[in-house]
Amino acid sequence: MAAAADLAQIPDVDIDSDGVFKYVLIRVHAVSPPGTPAGESKEIVRGYKWAEYHADIYDKVSGEMQKKGIDCECLGGGRISHQSQDKKIHVYGYSMGYGRAQHSISTEKIKARYPDYSVTWADDGY
């Protein structure tokens, strides 16, 4: 069974270094025995250029988490524009399948991972 320490080992943010790509906001939590309260959880951001669909990212991440004994749920998706040369990241849009992620949460996570970047978000666009 996964513990809070296992959650701490999971990076909050893993996104590609350049380009415009899809991303998902995922809540990960330790699997708790039936009838017991849910354990600790946290949100993670994952975004990759290789993903044609938001579900491609979630399927890959959820498979990796299950192997570690960690449950997860997709909270929504969107797009990320990452310009590493200009140190800019913009989070926007939504996922047709999962709906719009709370970009404000994603942005806070990204700001912590890239403290010297200008990180912005908007609910518009696709």
From Swiss-Prot:
Q: Which residues bind substrate?
A: 22, 95-97
Pfam families (UniProt xref): Ocnus (PF05005)
Q: Gene3D superfamilies recorded for this chain? A: Janus/Ocnus
| EC number of the protein | 3.9.1.3
InterPro entries linked to this entry: Janus, Janus_sf
List the keywords (alphabetical): Cytoplasm, Hydrolase, Protein phosphatase
Its annotated compartments are: Cytoplasm
Reactions catalysed, as given in the entry:
N(pros)-phospho-L-histidyl-[protein] + H2O = L-histidyl-[protein] + phosphate; N(tele)-phospho-L-histidyl-[protein] + H2O = L-histidyl-[protein] + phosphate
Kindly state one GO CC term assigned in the UniProt record.
cytosol
Q: Where along the chain is the active site annotated?
A: 54
Which GO biological process categories is it annotated with?
positive regulation of cell motility
Predominant location:
cytoplasm
One Gene Ontology molecular-function label: protein histidine phosphatase activity
Positions in coiled-coil regions: none
Q: What does this protein do?
A: Exhibits phosphohistidine phosphatase activity.
State the similarity comment.
Belongs to the janus family.
Q: How does it assemble?
A: Monomer.
**Protein name in the entry:** 14 kDa phosphohistidine phosphatase
Which organism is this entry from? Answer: Sus scrofa
